[in-house]
Amino acid sequence: MRSSCVLLAALLALAAYYVYIPLPSAVSDPWKLMLLDATFRGAQQVSNLIHSLGLNHHLIALNFIITSFGKQSARSSPKVKVTDTDFDGVEVRVFEGSPKPEEPLRRSVIYIHGGGWALASAKISYYDQLCTTMAEELNAVIVSIEYRLVPQVYFPEQIHDVIRATKYFLQPEVLDKYKVDPGRVGISGDSAGGNLAAALGQQFTYVASLKNKLKLQALVYPVLQALDFNTPSYQQSMNTPILPRHVMVRYWLDYFKGNYDFVEAMIVNNHTSLDVERAAALRARLDWTSLLPSSIKKNYKPIMQTTGNARIVQEIPQLLDAAASPLIAEQEVLEALPKTYILTCEHDVLRDDGIMYAKRLESAGVNVTLDHFEDGFHGCMIFTSWPTNFSVGIRTRNSYIKWLDQNL
């Protein structure tokens, strides 16, 4: 009996050691976040083991674990019709809310899920619940795009998928089929999905027939640049779940089919050092010393290497492509973008990407709403149901849907 108690105490201590990580005092539901982070880290470690044994790619294994516990079939309710179909060969899940009696034509949001271009699905419960709620509360048609993921495809194929599906949906006969008002269609996404939504919005500015097709864009803690991994938020939240800095850098390398040997060099900005001439013209477009307010910059200092590793950009030129990093787009591209909503979270390495993009868009004359949550963390908006229900998740979701309701 005594030995059993000792063993139990040891196991509990070990579990507590694995679960506990230091967190900012202001973050929402810290112990729940620790448990969520421990679960995700455990899944990552299992997938890495599977990869090291040569059984499968670690991202395929990790995504299998993630989607196995939450993927669900298209299930309609009295208020929302849900169907799986494809738009020009791209899988989508369509959520049709009931039209308002006084408005026979409905609004619509094209939604792109997050997951580092490699994980998650439009069909997992988190996104299914979010889009169902949006369709019901907005009386709208929500098109959730099931774009292809790394390692099946790499940049820019994910962008091609969302553009193809969106162009198909915007055809007059398709909008008519779903009873959607062509003047009230928006694009939205979270995290990597926010990146793809921003890229799509910019790509549409190059095509005259598509230039004014989208009424708005709503970007939720979007990832927008891969040039500077030492913005104040990257420095402040480098170890904060669920997106530590080294994980974000690896997602970028996965997206570009790059070499993990570059991770440490990129973390200290060796890929965009002063001797990398190809990056020189782009630095001013994300100069956080001028784009961020003093309350955000605090006492953080820029990390700018005099000499670095020019080989990184030579091997991965996509790092400097605005299609991958919408924050570095030219001014005239930004000027053509529609009304924009950007949601940022204080405890997120991507916080400053969103704030800088809002500033650049504002300077370009775009109507921008920046919605910042002091207790938010990356990914929080989809965590609204037990056992992963966070107070900030519910508040961010409600604020996001309220803005869409008022502006779409």
UniProtKB/Swiss-Prot annotation:
Q: Which residues are responsible for catalysis? A: S191, D348, H378
Q: Which reaction is catalysed here?
A: a 1-O-alkyl-2-acetyl-sn-glycerol + H2O = a 1-O-alkyl-sn-glycerol + acetate + H(+); 1-O-hexadecyl-2-acetyl-sn-glycerol + H2O = 1-O-hexadecyl-sn-glycerol + acetate + H(+); a cholesterol ester + H2O = cholesterol + a fatty acid + H(+); cholesteryl (9Z-octadecenoate) + H2O = cholesterol + (9Z)-octadecenoate + H(+)
Motif placement: Involved in the stabilization of the negatively charged intermediate by the formation of the oxyanion hole: 113-115
Which residues are noted as glycosylation sites?
A: N270, N367, N389
> What does gene deletion cause?
Mice are phenotypically normal but more sensitive to organophosphorus insecticide toxicity.
Give TM regions: 5-25
User: What's a Pfam family this protein contains?
Assistant: Abhydrolase_3
Example of a GO cellular component annotation carried by this entry: plasma membrane
Classification via SUPFAM superfamilies: alpha/beta-Hydrolases
Biological processes annotated in GO: ether lipid metabolic process; lipid catabolic process; xenobiotic metabolic process
Q: Where in the cell is it found?
A: Cell membrane; Microsome
| Major localization listed first in the record, in broad terms | membrane
Q: Which PROSITE patterns match?
A: LIPASE_GDXG_SER (PS01174)
Q: How is it modified after translation?
A: N-glycosylated.
Q: What is the role of the protein in this entry? A: Hydrolyzes 2-acetyl monoalkylglycerol ether (1-O-alkyl-2-acetyl-sn-glycerol), the penultimate precursor of the pathway for de novo synthesis of platelet-activating factor. May be responsible for the hydrolysis of cholesterol esters (such as cholesteryl (9Z-octadecenoate)) in macrophages. Also involved in organ detoxification by hydrolyzing exogenous organophosphorus compounds.
Family as reported in the entry's similarity comment: Belongs to the 'GDXG' lipolytic enzyme family.
Protein name, UniProt field: Neutral cholesterol ester hydrolase 1
What taxonomic ancestry is recorded?
Eukaryota, Metazoa, Chordata, Craniata, Vertebrata
The gene coding this protein: Nceh1
